[in-house]
Amino acid sequence: MSTPHWFDQGSLVLASNNKGKVAEFEKLFEQLKLPVEIIPQGHLNIPDAIEDGLSFIENAIIKARHASKISGKPAMADDSGICVPVLGGAPGIYSARYAGEHGDDAANNAKLLNDLLPFRKNGEAIEGMFVCVLALVTHAEDPLPQIFQGIWHGEILEAPRGENGFGYDPLFWLPELQVSSAELSKEEKNKISHRGQAMQLFRESLQK
């Protein structure tokens, strides 16, 4: 297996201070059996980057470069969110602060439900998708960031269901499984989620 030189360093900074994301990533790396130590940027006192990009890809790269510059280590960043076509793709890159305050899951969910009220017709399903973009940089000025993208299709419920996960998981319905994302275990979710898909592509890149 040919691996990039950064892989031999044995550690990778995860450019996130989101506890839910960090927990999912730690579980994903454990499941994928990758011999890489994941160091959440908070453990290195790295503050959040200013996300001023206009796309998931741009923001993921911004966050990865920020963490790599401060730590001097390779860094991986996740930029993810939920996109609803009838809302023009919103909440999109603003998913974490959709209701105003960053990371207020309850308020974000309530705003999404309220914004969808005019589109609820005769019980018709409203399509939604979770998007995850991972950006990996070997150093802060890496001219060729590696990008891995996962998209998870589903529907938006009219009320929350389930106690697991975080973010919009309680509103994300999987018709083929007849459960919400918040009703899946971490292991079940990681096998099929947007983040799980992107991580699998990352793993495959290490085997090329």
Swiss-Prot record:
It is an enzyme of class 3 (hydrolase). Keywords: Hydrolase, Magnesium, Metal-binding, Nucleotide metabolism, Nucleotide-binding. One of its GO terms (molecular function) is dITP diphosphatase activity. The keyword Cytoplasm does not apply. Pfam families: Ham1p_like. Its cofactor is Mg(2+). Gene3D superfamilies: 3.90.950.10. Homodimer. This is dITP/XTP pyrophosphatase.
